[in-house]
């Protein structure tokens, strides 16, 4: 996840001096569509925070000086969720990305079964039905 201040700018300027930004390329190619990543890498042009958000490079834009606070707010919100479920989800997200579409759906179905059988799923559904906060496993 990424939070940027409204005045933030992003670029891969190496091409201006005869260097291709190959290490930033790895992150860009995994977080943006090919066309957006290639445009940034081949032009070296600066993009504003609003364009970065439109492209999917950042999740949120906040007022100057509040990016860290907003990032902590997001982290705090995530920390209220089941640690086991977050771990299952993160693992599945990254593992399926390397699979064929068919294999990814098969894998995701297995992950869903694994998740549904987990104690925290039972606790979360029970808490929802009983209108109380869940007590996640630690």
Describe the predicted segments one by one.
Residues 28, 52, 89, 128:
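Terminal peptide-recognition signature
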Residues 117-121, 127:
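Interdomain hinge/lid region at the active-site interface
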Residues 24-27, 36, 88, 108-112, ...:
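Hydrophobic alpha-helical segments typical of transmembrane helices
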Residues 1-40, 55, 70:
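CoA-thioester-processing core
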Residues 44-51:
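Acidic, divalent-metal-coordinating active-site segment for phosphoryl/phosphodiester hydrolysis
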Residues 3-8, 58-106, 113, 119, ...:
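C-terminal long alpha-helix characteristic of the crotonase
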Residues 126-138:
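Terminal low-complexity tails and localization/encapsulation signals of metabolic enzymes
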Residues 55-56, 131:
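Structural motif
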């Amino acid at each position: 996840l990424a939070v940027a201040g409204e005045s933030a700018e992003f670029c891969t300027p190496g091409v201006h001096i005869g260097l291709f930004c190959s290490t930033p390329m790895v992150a860009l190619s995994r977080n943006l569509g090919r066309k957006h990543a290639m445009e940034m890498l081949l032009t070296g042009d600066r993009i504003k925070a609003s364009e970065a958000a439109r492209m999917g490079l950042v999740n949120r834009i906040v007022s100057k000086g509040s990016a860290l606070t907003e990032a902590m707010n997001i982290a705090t919100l995530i920390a209220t969720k089941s640690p086991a479920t977050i771990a299952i989800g993160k693992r599945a997200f990254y593992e399926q990305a390397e699979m064929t579409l068919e294999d990814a759906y098969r894998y995701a179905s297995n992950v869903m079964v694994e998740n549904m059988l987990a104690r925290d799923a039972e606790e979360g559904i029970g808490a929802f039905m009983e209108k109380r906060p869940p007590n996640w496993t630690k």
